[in-house]
């Protein structure tokens, strides 16, 4: 596309219309606006002169000259105001990631279109947006960006930044970027053409390939207020411009106000970063040392594991070889021993077989006898049980007999009582009937007279009845009482007679009962007989009863005697059997007691001799065993000591190799250690002296390395505080030749501070807290300072200075001048050379000290672990001597065992014979008793008789005892008993008749008064009737009582009779059972005496014991036979096995000998036998050695995984059939390590010594770097102090900023201020850092974490409620090292009656928000300038410009306030406003977009403000 356009279609470059709207309006078309430079502390602030837009939509080549205060763009919608501002912003921040012109894209969108609103503002082809600036140095700089649309759907724009310097002020920017090709045509130059054009006019053109370089240039030349190092800085700057452009309070800025207002403390942060970097580097070096140490440990590990791997296998093979030889010898011994045992077992088999046959025969005989004894015992037990039942039944029968007699008497008494009660009851009934008859008679009388008459008649009837009964014809009322007394006396006499007869009758009955009882007892014993023969029979029985009783009492003695005789007979039979057995076993024929006693004496003497020999043998054997046990204990003790002694010998040998000495005694070791301590102390003193010297040199180097030459860092702070410069900094470029002069010229004041005004500084001196003891201040201009302030005269060796009228100072030229950087650098070079020499000497001596310390450590370990054993005798030599002695003792013990075995066999035989004799000798008298059988028969006959009497007494003893006291009653039979009984009956009958007569007479006597009623005796009829009634009632009550008594006596008689019947029935049944039991015991045919059971049991137990003993012996013999037979098979197998094992072991020994010879040859030829033959391993088991070898093999596989040669060698060595390959691997490892030794550093060929020297050197380096790390470390308290000072400084700065905001007013807002506070959580962190809490020091003393991580962990510890998210501790710690994170910033406004409020858009009107937001932005820009002042040139004050779009939202008063603010703060402002805005000050451009045909352009007219003055 052609870059040529018709000028008439775009803009008239030379004849723009000028409209004069006021007399004071001045035409400004195509003429630069008069520009005035304001000063800032004597330095003029840079200004933006103009904005040039080339080939933008509506602007082909338009330059907007910018007012020094306010430039207003006025026009309607679409006039191009936003496009103009967009060109300014694009030239200022050419970053497509940030540019976003929202009012030309989607409203309310955060993303916008893909071109960010820029693509549509450009015309096709090359476009430019250029800013023309003039900085504080009066340099004209044109900075801009070349824009070009990129064809495609994405509507992308390509940007390239550039700058132009050296262009004259008269040169119009438009003419630079265009070329006139005709009278009314011009062409836009591309970038290369522009570059050529600029170079042709003698200016400088520079293109930038990064936005950072572009902004760096703009900062250095004073165009932007802040160095934009990163995208974050550019984003902040763009957000500030955007907030200014669209007005209001930007939440993006207020939310992160700290990042905008508070400067980043780069110095402190860099110091922390440098410190942590140095610590990190130091720790990396330490880690590298650890890696080297791990390599050294790897080599050491390789040597150790290789030695364990090969030496354990070497010693295991040696132990196995020795074990195989011993096993072969042991197998041969077992082979011979098994053959001997086989011969012995065959002899035992024959003997035991013969004994087993004898025991079987004897056992059969004993089984028959035992079964007979068991049967006999069962019969005896049955007889005893029957006898017990018989005895029990006899006792029961005797008891029942007594009870029957007693019960019979009780029944007879009850019967008599019952009959008497019945008679009394009948008599009472008769009397009741008589009384009732009288009452009936009385009742028949109708009145009392009749009653009396009746009574009289009854009395007459009673009198007649009495006469009749008594046979008294002369009985009358007068003599009735006499007769009554007479008959009553007769009745009493008859009663006495009856009682006498009853007494006689009872006596007769007793005699009759005794006779009957005795007769029954006699019949029970002797059977039925006449009553007359009972006395003779009873007499005969009682005569024989005492002898039978005595004979029965002698039955137990007879039984005992018989039992003793039978036992004696059994003993006799047993003794005969023992004698036969003894003769059979001893092959003798001893019969008499004398022969047996003589043989017994001989055996006792033989036993004593054999026992004495055995005792001597046992004592000798015990002595030998004790000696052998002592030797074994000594051997075990030496075996336990041997590994430690061998280890001690190896350690001693290593010490001798390391020290080059030979030690014969422990005292030699102690003396050598003492001498080494003296040498170590001397070298340590030399090392410490060199260390002190090196520290001094480091301190001098550090002091001289200060960039300004100040030796005290406090001077820098004071110079900054006073606004001065250090004198040493002014003379920093002094040559080496002039350095001595100036050093002597200023003398002690060579470290003075040059200030502009001493009076201003003098006021601050009283407030100084931390300063040097002597502080020199010199008044002068730091930019033009010379030595004219002093009056001096140079001499040959020094300088004389006139201090005052009365004071001179003479200073000699220093030998080593330090005034000026050249002198310091020369001195630094000398000090560094000297320091290197001292460091080298220190390193060498430190190495020697480490070497001596390591050697002393080895000696100390040796003294603590091995000194007690190292110089003792060789335990293995002692063990071999002990083994030889033990073998001798074992041979002697074997001989003793053989002899003892023979003696014990003889002793056992003699004891066996003596035991049999001891059983026989006590029974010699039994053997001599020949009439024993006759005595047994005689005793048995006596016992039979006694048992018969005992049985008779047992059966009839109770009966005879009952018969004995009443036997005399049998002498006379009581026959007159019946006559006496008849006489008693007659007497009782007479008594009854007399009593009836007495009763009749008594009735008459009672009725005697009735005889007086013969005529009219009727008065007492009623009384008599009443008496009769009472009499009747009494008689009835008596009758009831007697009836009850009769009933009771009948019941009692029935109960007694029932008991009698039960007793009689029980007596009959038991008597029958007793007879049956007597018959059964007779059928058993055994005697059931007291000792029968015991004798039967003893007999059975004896036979059972003999049978059990015989069976046990037979079982034992059979087991022994089975065992011998099985042992015979086992012995045959054992003989074959031991023979086979012996041959196998012998073959193994022969086969292993070849491989072992190869191993020995390799180890001896390579001088490795001493390392492999570790005797202490010989005392470990094969499993332990194999486990050691396997563990070492696993470690070696890992260790040599990266070494192909060693890996292959190790793989070959794993073949257990070829142990020589392990030795070859051992040699290969040592050869590999020898090749790795650096001979220029380590002067040894032994890898172990090389590792030792490496360890010493690495320990020295580790100690040195650890000390350096301690120096680099920073304390938490110092960090807290730095943070507090920085925060205090920034708080003061914010306070100063607030002073500039006090008079700002927009609408109801009367003032604006910033509120800064320290966060509570971070205040706690500062307190914890500066406090004395020891619980937090563990974090800062931990070398495993950085200081930043320690800060983060401390923050988390004191604020556990805060969620840190996914951020690392290092990230959090770095944030905590930034003081800005400790502060909270808020903007407050003073609005009307509400007072101070938080500045938020919702609480303010639009104009108030715009004004407040502009105030905040001005504060941010001012803060940025202050922040960057230290890193910007001192002669540069940056440009200051802000934007405001849609200014119609501000009222006129606010616009005036804004203009006043710009004037007071020396700030330029670019405003876009509708056409109705016409500010009184500044410059206004009226923009009108015109369309001609298919093309459009913006018509621009510039106006000077109404209030402007020349």
Curated annotation (Swiss-Prot):
Keywords carried by this UniProt record: ATP-binding, Cell cycle, Cell division, Chromosome partition, Coiled coil, Cytoplasm, DNA condensation, DNA-binding, Nucleotide-binding
Pfam families according to UniProt: MukB, MukB_hinge, SbcC_Walker_B
Gene3D superfamilies: 1.20.58.850, 3.40.1140.10, Immunoglobulin FC, subunit C, MukB, hinge domain
GO-annotated cellular components: cytoplasm; nucleoid
Principal subcellular localisation of the protein: cytoplasm
Cell compartments where the protein resides: Cytoplasm, Nucleoid
Record region (Flexible hinge): 707-824
Gene Ontology terms describing biological process: cell division; chromosome condensation; chromosome segregation; DNA replication
Binding site for ATP: 75-82
InterPro entries, sorted: MukB (IPR012090), MukB/SMC (IPR050308), MukB_hinge (IPR032520), MukB_hinge_sf (IPR042501), MukB_N_dom (IPR007406), P-loop_NTPase (IPR027417)
GO MF assignments: ATP binding; DNA binding
Coiled coil: 6-30, 346-506, 553-611, 673-706, 821-846, 876-1064, 1094-1149, 1249-1304
Function: Plays a central role in chromosome condensation, segregation and cell cycle progression. Functions as a homodimer, which is essential for chromosome partition. Involved in negative DNA supercoiling in vivo, and by this means organize and compact chromosomes. May achieve or facilitate chromosome segregation by condensation DNA from both sides of a centrally located replisome during cell division.
Domain remark in the UniProt entry: The hinge domain, which separates the large intramolecular coiled coil regions, allows the homodimerization, forming a V-shaped homodimer.
Family: Belongs to the SMC family. MukB subfamily.
Quaternary data: Homodimerization via its hinge domain. Binds to DNA via its C-terminal region. Interacts, and probably forms a ternary complex, with MukE and MukF via its C-terminal region. The complex formation is stimulated by calcium or magnesium. Interacts with tubulin-related protein FtsZ.
HAMAP family: MukB
Protein name, per record: Chromosome partition protein MukB
Upper classification of the organism: Bacteria, Pseudomonadati, Pseudomonadota, Gammaproteobacteria, Pasteurellales
């Amino acid at each position: 596309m052609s870059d040529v356009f018709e000028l008439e279609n775009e803009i008239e470059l030379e004849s723009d219309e000028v409209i004069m709207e006021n007399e004071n309006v001045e035409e400004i078309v195509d003429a630069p606006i008069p520009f005035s430079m304001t000063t800032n502390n004597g330095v003029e602030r840079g200004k933006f002169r103009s904005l040039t837009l080339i080939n933008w939509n509506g602007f082909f080549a338009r330059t907007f000259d910018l007012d020094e205060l306010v430039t207003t763009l006025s026009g309607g919608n679409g006039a191009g105001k936003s496009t103009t501002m967009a060109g300014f912003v694009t030239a200022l921040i050419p970053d497509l990631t940030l540019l976003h012109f929202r009012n030309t894209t989607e409203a309310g969108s955060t993303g916008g279109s893909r071109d960010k609103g820029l693509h549509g503002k450009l015309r096709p082809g090359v476009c430019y947006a250029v800013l023309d600036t003039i900085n504080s140095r009066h340099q004209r700089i044109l900075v801009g960006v070349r824009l070009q649309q990129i064809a495609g759907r994405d509507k992308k724009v390509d940007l390239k930044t550039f700058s132009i310097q050296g262009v004259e002020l008269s040169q119009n920017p438009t003419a630079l970027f265009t070329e006139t090709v005709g009278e009314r045509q011009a062409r836009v130059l591309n970038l290369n053409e522009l570059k050529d054009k600029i170079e042709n006019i003698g200016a400088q053109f520079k293109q930038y390939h990064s936005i950072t370089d572009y902004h760096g240039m703009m900062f250095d030349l004073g165009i932007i207020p802040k160095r934009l190092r990163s995208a974050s800085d550019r984003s902040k700057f763009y957000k500030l411009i955007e907030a200014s452009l669209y007005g209001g309070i930007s939440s993006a800025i207020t939310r992160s106000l700290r990042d905008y207002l508070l400067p980043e403390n780069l110095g402190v942060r860099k110091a922390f970063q440098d410190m942590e970097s140095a610590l990190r580097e130091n720790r990396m070096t330490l880690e590298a040392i650890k890696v080297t140490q791990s390599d050294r440990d790897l080599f050491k590990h390789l040597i150790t594991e290789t030695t364990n791997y090969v030496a354990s296998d070497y010693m295991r093979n040696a132990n196995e070889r020795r074990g195989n030889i011993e096993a072969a010898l042991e197998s041969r011994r077992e082979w011979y021993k098994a053959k001997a045992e086989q011969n012995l077992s065959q002899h035992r088999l024959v003997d035991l077989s013969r004994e087993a046959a004898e025991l079987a025969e004897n056992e059969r005989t004993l089984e028959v006898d035992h079964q007979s004894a068991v049967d006999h015992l069962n019969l005896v037990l049955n007889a005893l049980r029957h006898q017990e039942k018989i005895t029990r039944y006899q006792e029961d029968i005797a008891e029942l007999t007594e009870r029957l007699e007693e019960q019979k008497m009780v029944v007879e008494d009850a019967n008599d009582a019952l009959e008497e009660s019945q008679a009394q009851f009948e008599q009472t009934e008769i009397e009741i009937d008589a009384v009732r008859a009288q009452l009936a008679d009385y009742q028949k009388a109708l009145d009392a007279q009749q009653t009396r008459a009746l009574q009289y008649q009854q009395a007459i009837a009673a009198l007649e009845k009495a006469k009749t009964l008594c046979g008294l014809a002369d009985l009358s009322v007068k003599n009735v009482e006499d007769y009554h007394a007479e008959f009553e006396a007769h009745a009493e006499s008859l009663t006495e007679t009856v009682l006498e007869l009853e007494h006689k009758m009872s006596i007769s009955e007793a005699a009759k009962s005794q006779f009957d009882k005795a007769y029954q007892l006699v019949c029970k014993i002797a059977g039925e007989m006449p009553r007359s023969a009972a006395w003779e029979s009873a007499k005969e029985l009682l005569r024989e009863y005492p002898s039978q009783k005595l004979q029965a009492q002698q039955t137990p003695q007879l039984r005992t005697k018989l039992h003793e005789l039978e036992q004696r007979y059994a003993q006799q039979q047993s003794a005969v059997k023992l004698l036969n057995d003894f003769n059979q076993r001893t092959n003798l024929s001893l019969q008499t007691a004398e022969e047996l006693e003589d043989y017994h004496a001989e055996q006792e003497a033989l036993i004593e001799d054999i026992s004495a020999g055995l005792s001597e043998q046992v004592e000798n054997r015990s002595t030998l065993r004790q000696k052998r046990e002592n030797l074994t204990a000594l051997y075990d003790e030496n075996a336990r000591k041997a590994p430690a002694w061998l280890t001690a010998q190896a350690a001693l040998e290593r010490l001798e190799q390391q020290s080059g000495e030979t030690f014969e005694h422990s005292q030699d070791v102690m003396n050598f250690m003492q001498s080494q301590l003296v040498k170590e102390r001397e070298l340590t003193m030399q090392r410490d002296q060199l260390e002190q010297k090196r520290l001094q040199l480091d301190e001098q180097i550090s002091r001289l390395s200060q960039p300004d030459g100040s030796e005290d860092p406090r001077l820098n702070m004071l110079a900054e505080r006073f606004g001065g410069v250090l004198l040493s900094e002014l003379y920093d470029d002094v040559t080496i030749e002039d350095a001595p002069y100036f050093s002597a010229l200023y003398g002690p004041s060579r470290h003075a501070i040059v200030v502009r005004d001493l009076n201003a500084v003098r006021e601050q001196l009283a407030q100084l807290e931390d300063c040097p003891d002597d502080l020199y201040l010199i008044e002068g201009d730091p930019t033009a300072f010379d030595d004219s302030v002093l009056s001096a005269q140079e001499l040959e060796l020094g300088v004389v200075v006139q201090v005052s009228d009365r004071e001179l100072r003479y200073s000699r030229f220093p030998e080593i001048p330090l005034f000026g950087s050249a002198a310091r650098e020369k001195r630094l070079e000398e000090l560094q050379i000297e320091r290197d020499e001292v460091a080298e000497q220190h390193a060498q001596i430190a190495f020697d000290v480490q070497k001596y310390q390591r050697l002393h450590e080895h000696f100390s370990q040796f003294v603590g672990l091995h000194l007690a054993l190292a110089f003792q005798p060789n335990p293995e030599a002692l063990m071999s001597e002990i083994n030889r002695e033990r073998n001798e003792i074992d041979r002697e013990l074997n001989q003793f065992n053989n002899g003892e075995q023979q003696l014990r066999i003889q002793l056992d035989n003699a004891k066996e014979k003596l035991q049999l004799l001891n059983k026989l000798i006590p029974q010699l008298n039994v053997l001599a008793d020949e009439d024993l059988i006759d005595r047994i028969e005689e005793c048995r006959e006596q016992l039979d008789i006694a048992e018969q009497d005992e049985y008779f007494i047992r059966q009839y003893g109770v009966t005879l005892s009952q018969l004995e006291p009443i036997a005399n009653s049998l002498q006379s039979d009581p026959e007159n008993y019946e006559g006496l009984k008849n006489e008693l009956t007659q007497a009782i009958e007479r008594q009854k008749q007399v009593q009836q007569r007495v009763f009749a007479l008594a009735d008459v006597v009672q009725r005697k008064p009735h005889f007086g009623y013969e005529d009219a005796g009727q008065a007492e009829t009623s009384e008599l009737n009443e008496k009769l009634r009472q009499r009747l009632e009494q008689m009835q009550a008596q009758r009831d009582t007697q009836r009850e008594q009769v009933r009771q006596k009948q019941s009692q008689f029935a109960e007694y009779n029932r008991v009698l019947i039960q007793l009689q029935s029980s007596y009959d049944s038991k008597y029958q059972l007793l007879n049956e039991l007597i018959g059964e015991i007779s059928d058993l045919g055994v005697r059931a005496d007291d000792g029968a059971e015991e004798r039967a049991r003893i007999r059975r137990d004896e036979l059972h014991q003999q049978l059990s003993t015989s069976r046990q012996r037979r079982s034992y013999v059979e087991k022994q036979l089975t065992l011998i037979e099985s042992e015979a098979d086992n012995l045959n197998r054992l003989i074959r096995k031991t023979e086979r094992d012996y041959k196998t072991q012998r073959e193994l020994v022969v086969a292993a000998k070849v491989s072992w010879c190869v191993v020995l040859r390799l180890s001896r030829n390579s001088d490795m036998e001493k390392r492999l033959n570790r005797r202490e391993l010989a005392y470990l088991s094969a499993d332990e050695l194999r486990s050691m070898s396997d563990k070492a093999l696993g470690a070696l596989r890992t260790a040599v995984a990266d070494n192909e040669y060693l890996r292959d060698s190790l793989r070959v060595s794993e073949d257990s059939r070829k142990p020589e390959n392990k030795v070859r691997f051992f040699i290969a490892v040592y050869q590999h390590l020898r090749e790795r030794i650096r001979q220029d550093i380590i002067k040894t060929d032994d890898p172990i010594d090389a590792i030792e020297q490496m360890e010493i050197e690495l320990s020295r380096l580790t100690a040195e770097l650890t000390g350096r790390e301690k120096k680099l470390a920073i304390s938490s308290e110092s960090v807290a102090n730095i943070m507090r000072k920085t925060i205090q400084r920034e708080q003061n700065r914010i306070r100063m900023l607030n002073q500039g905001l006090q008079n700002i007013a927009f609408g109801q807002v009367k003032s604006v201020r910033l509120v800064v506070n320290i966060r509570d959580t971070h205040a706690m962190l500062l307190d914890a850092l500066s406090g004395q809490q020891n619980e937090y020091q563990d974090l800062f003393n931990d070398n495993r974490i950085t200081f930043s991580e320690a800060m983060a962990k401390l923050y988390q510890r004191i604020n556990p409620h805060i969620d840190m998210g996914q951020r690392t501790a290092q990230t959090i710690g770095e944030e905590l090292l930034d003081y800005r994170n400790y502060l909270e910033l808020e903007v407050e406004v003073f609005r009307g009656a509400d007072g101070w409020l938080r500045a938020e858009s919702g609480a303010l009107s639009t104009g108030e928000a715009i004004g407040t937001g502009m105030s905040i932005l001005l504060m941010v820009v001012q803060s940025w300038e202050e922040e960057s002042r230290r890193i910007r040139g001192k002669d540069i004050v940056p440009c200051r410009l802000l934007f405001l779009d849609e200014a119609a939202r501000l009222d006129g008063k606010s616009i005036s306030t804004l203009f006043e603010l710009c004037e007071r703060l020396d700030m330029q402002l670019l405003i876009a406003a509708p056409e109705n805005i016409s500010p009184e000050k500044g410059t206004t451009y009226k923009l009108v977009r015109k369309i001609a045909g298919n093309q459009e352009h913006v018509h621009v007219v510039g106006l000077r403000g109404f209030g402007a003055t020349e």
